[in-house]
A protein has these predicted regions:
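Short, mixed-charge low-complexity intrinsically disordered segments
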Residues: 39-79
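Acidic, Ser/Thr- and proline-rich intrinsically disordered linker/docking segments
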Residues: 1-40, 70-79
Length: 79
């Protein structure tokens, strides 16, 4: 399932918060939150949107720390 995760840490461009488009094997928001709360780090696949083509491209696997997560939103993949 795809999620937009707002992290309380600087972004690549120097902003104070960092948003990540990630995919995790969870089947719901509640399941993803449960996975985050059980471990210090959760492995996700990170994606970025290509501004030219509009397609989502993988940046590979990333481990995120639940202590820096400020907000999580489900991304609707059926656009």
């Amino acid at each position: 399932m795809r999620f937009l995760v707002t992290m309380h840490m600087p972004s690549y461009s120097g902003n104070l918060v960092h948003q990540m488009n990630v995919e995790h094997k969870s089947t719901s928001l509640e399941e993803f939150v449960d996975a985050l709360s059980k471990e210090d780090f959760v492995v996700v696949e990170e994606f970025y949107r290509d501004p030219t083509t509009g397609s989502d491209n993988s940046r590979g696997m990333t481990a995120i720390n639940h202590r820096y997560v400020g907000k999580i939103k489900v991304i609707n993949q059926h656009r």
